[in-house]
Amino acid sequence: MDTLWTVVNVVVMLILIGLLIWMQKKHVSFTKRVFTGLALGIIFGFILQWAFGTQSEVVSKSTDWFSLVGSGYVGLLQMVVIPLIMVSIISAIMNLKGRQNLGKMSGSIIAVLLITVAIAASVSIVTSLSFNLKAIEIQAGDREQAQGQKLEEKVGDVKDKSIPQQVLEFIPTNPFADMTGARRSSTLAVVIFSAFIGVAVLGIDRKKPEQAATFRKMVEAVYAVVLRIVTLVLRLTPYGILALITKTTATTNIDEILKLAKFVGASYVA
């Protein structure tokens, strides 16, 4: 019987996905399709929770199938992150004119980053005090507890290393491994490696302009391809949101969702 209900739930999910595809063919705006996927996911998830319960075998098997869409979408997003970071940084640096611009840009980026972080922290503090928010009110599920345990292990690893050792981890000793996210500092290492490539192109530009021009054309072509891939992945957002929200609402207690909604509301106010 559980298998039958699982099949029914999967068929319903396919129908909802078909509805979103129909909306796309009717040229409904992207924003409306995303919010439609969000609303359908919430409704379908609550129906599953009401009909079977959060811990039922039917919900577990159904959400496993839903993950083909939801987790698949997240995986595709992760796929484009590193290539997008690399080509964006390389393209930005190699198109600068002179080292002074590079220094000014670096200083401006750091200044803007520090200012925005300070503003965000201040707004968060004021909002949390205004709403009297306490994260302890939200009970963590098995997934959250497992993630918290992993985070504690990572924090422990950081504490065991001195500051010089932590700084040395930023050096991309194996940039190809860092592109796979092999280390905790892989993303920053990729950024540094990409910056080195951009600066190297500026150096070659003075001595061998023809080779630099050839490399620029190649990077511009790769950049265009990566942006196209990003566009294709983002078009899947309504379907990914539908599957992810359905799984979340079907496997999370309503009381905890309501508590979390308070935090979400406060976040929008902030």
Segments and roles (model prediction):
Residues 37-55, 116-122:
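A generic, lipid-embedded transmembrane alpha helix
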Residues 58-65, 103, 254-262:
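Membrane-water interface of transmembrane alpha-helices in multipass transporters/channels
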Residues 143-150:
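Acidic, negatively charged sequence tracts
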